[in-house]
Amino acid sequence: MDGFGLAEPGPGNAISQARTPCLDEVFATRPWTKLEASGEAVGLPAGQMGNSEVGHLNIGAGRVVFQELTRINRACADGSLAANPVLNEAFAAAARPGAALHLMGLVSDGGVHSSNEHLYALARAAKAAGASHIVVHCFMDGRDVPPRSGAGYLDELEGVLAELTDEGCTAEIGSISGRYYAMDRDNRWERVEQAWRAVVAAEPRADATAAEVMAASYAADVTDE
């Protein structure tokens, strides 16, 4: 039963509020135990919430399976990310005269589809490998994190990009989209096209800072997604 969990009874616990005679009988008459479904018990960083994919994978494997989030975190920490041959091939191409490295993806620490620390590690590794121009195309989250948290993530990102620029690498935000458009999974081209045009054609152009763009969106009651 996907989504079933054990927690203290209360008004917000749908399971404890429901009438569950079959489950009550199973718990009363059959052996059972509890499994942790988040954090290090399922191969995620400590304190990181689990999700359905993580639960299915660990139960099916019968052991702790280190998730991509944990593996990439470790690669960032031990330096092996910067030594990845595929990444280094891209960094080498970006180091050529007149070239630029374009990074695109979800900008949040939701931990389901993204970790902004991975973005920072990639940008720093590219700069260390000789890239002189880095452009970040930001897909705002608002689903795995609060719906109006994006402005804070962009402010933090701009701080990292400013550090790289101070070190001699032009690092900047190229476009801002919402995941509703940029990460549509249902083949809705009318959505994806808007994010694609923002990345490829810089349409529509905005003569404003990232903070101004986000503030205008919030003022119009448009959230990050």
Segments and roles (model prediction):
Residues A162, S177, R185, W189-E225:
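Terminal, contiguous helix-loop blocks that mediate binding/assembly
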Residues F4-L164, T170-Y181, R188-E190, Q194, ...:
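Active-site nucleophile/metal-coordination loop of metallo-enzymes that catalyze phosphate/sulfate
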